């Protein structure tokens, strides 16, 4: 019956746009022509006018789609997303067009399958579902449901924070500070280069690398979208980077978009923290419930009810934050804004730096490999500098663990040069501890901040949860966002940095020697050896203040000087011969109460007279004398410098 009616009407309802019934000359079809013999028309008179009107509308629709098909044939799609207008406007119009086309196709299929009795209803449905045709395409107010960011909101928020930091670093105020202050700072000039163009080229390369990381994350998000127009965005970014055309108000729009996104990021950070609280409450609730189920007591406490109330309230908080944060935002909505930000950053970096980083470095790739960042040594050298600065602050009380840690962390080149440099190091005049610290401060005052920036840069916002756990107000400038790579040890020359570190270690050795000497109340043996005489150690002037020697010590010294040694007898046997007498007065024994609570020291001075008997000078360091007698003053093998007496810290 349906096929019979379609033939009698002269309309092909199976056509895609239902326009085959319209005459080629534009005339209206004659629905009232005479029927063949034996057949009667089933068309109601009032129905004929409605069908003529609907066919006219379908004819107009056919003309529109035929125009779009001819346009599509001229522009062959090569897989690269094309945005002839602003990306957000073009994407919305394309999305609306796809929705309208799908509606027309679906309605046409329904119309071809429908019977004559439902023809009017189907045509009415087709007319009511069609949207107005505008210059931007078919606009539809239907939002895509079920395509929210969800758990990806935290990763997207981390990406938005990166874009905010990059835009902030490209502001006019920060660029003026970069060119007027940072590039002329002592740390950059001494460790990196004093060529302004070379420094500017390094900064431009760093900014483009940050943009590449940000755009790479945007491309990754686009490939996960259900809408195919967001796929392969890298091709689109490559094309617009080669055809950079300035656009009006692009900067103002991008800054406004970033500010709006940062508000959502703030709510997302709060959501991250509240989800952790919710997880702990759920875990506590389940544990409490199991305990009460396994409990022998029939009466249950109020603890489970309280936890249940807190859990219910926390779920409401999480639900509210999900609506305010990026969690409930649509994928396409956020992608539009991220694409606009990438477009703005491409133009902004080009306007500020031009093609500075495109020019090859004069020193070539070999010089680039000698820098600490590409070699992966920036953070290690920064830790060494921080250790030196810490030891300078407490030079008089350096522990053996701190000394060993610093020595073991030194690079091989510095270890090889340390021995010869310490032996050849001479001071024109005797310097006090304050003067030595002032001399070291001339280098440390610019070297330590560079090391600190390196540490901060390595512990910056990298992981998804770090920015959320800090609890920072992301609507303001993030902490550490103003640190540029040029301010760290990343671009520092390895050779220059090792020279400055070696100089600080030599001065540190001299400082520790002087600090220990002053702490004992007088000078001591100089640890700085002359290159002409490295074997003999000379005693310097007498100490300013002489410690009091007890009566027992004086008696022991007198007896030791009068005693005659037996030939061919070792020292230990010689002492054993006077065992009974030594037991009566034994202040030199480690088990004696005299020894307890006395601080140990590694310095010693022993005078010998022509008689061959050692005279122990307790005025210099009586603790070292005990170590020599007990033979516990032998240093570890790897400390060759300590064994020679050249290194005292």
From Swiss-Prot:
<dbReference type="GO" id="GO:0045927">
    <property type="term" value="P:positive regulation of growth"/>
</dbReference>
<keyword id="KW-0449">Lipoprotein</keyword>
<dbReference type="InterPro" id="IPR021864">
    <property type="entry name" value="DUF3475"/>
</dbReference>
<dbReference type="Pfam" id="PF05003">
    <property type="entry name" value="DUF668"/>
</dbReference>
<dbReference type="GO" id="GO:0006109">
    <property type="term" value="P:regulation of carbohydrate metabolic process"/>
</dbReference>
<keyword id="KW-0539">Nucleus</keyword>
<keyword id="KW-0217">Developmental protein</keyword>
<dbReference type="GO" id="GO:0009744">
    <property type="term" value="P:response to sucrose"/>
</dbReference>
<dbReference type="GO" id="GO:0005634">
    <property type="term" value="C:nucleus"/>
</dbReference>
<feature type="region of interest" description="Disordered">
    <location>
        <begin position="18"/>
        <end position="43"/>
    </location>
</feature>
<comment type="function">
    <text>Promotes plant growth, especially at the vegetative stage, probably via the regulation of phytosulfokine (PSK) signaling; PSK are peptide phytohormones acting as growth factors. Together with PSI2 and PSI3, required during vegetative growth and reproduction. May also have a function in carbohydrate metabolism.</text>
</comment>
<dbReference type="GO" id="GO:0005739">
    <property type="term" value="C:mitochondrion"/>
</dbReference>
<dbReference type="GO" id="GO:0043434">
    <property type="term" value="P:response to peptide hormone"/>
</dbReference>
<keyword id="KW-0519">Myristate</keyword>
<feature type="lipid moiety-binding region" description="N-myristoyl glycine">
    <location>
        <position position="2"/>
    </location>
</feature>
<dbReference type="InterPro" id="IPR045021">
    <property type="entry name" value="PSI1/2/3"/>
</dbReference>
<dbReference type="Pfam" id="PF11961">
    <property type="entry name" value="DUF3475"/>
</dbReference>
<dbReference type="GO" id="GO:0005886">
    <property type="term" value="C:plasma membrane"/>
</dbReference>
<dbReference type="InterPro" id="IPR007700">
    <property type="entry name" value="DUF668"/>
</dbReference>
<protein>
    <recommendedName>
        <fullName>Protein PSK SIMULATOR 3</fullName>
    </recommendedName>
</protein>
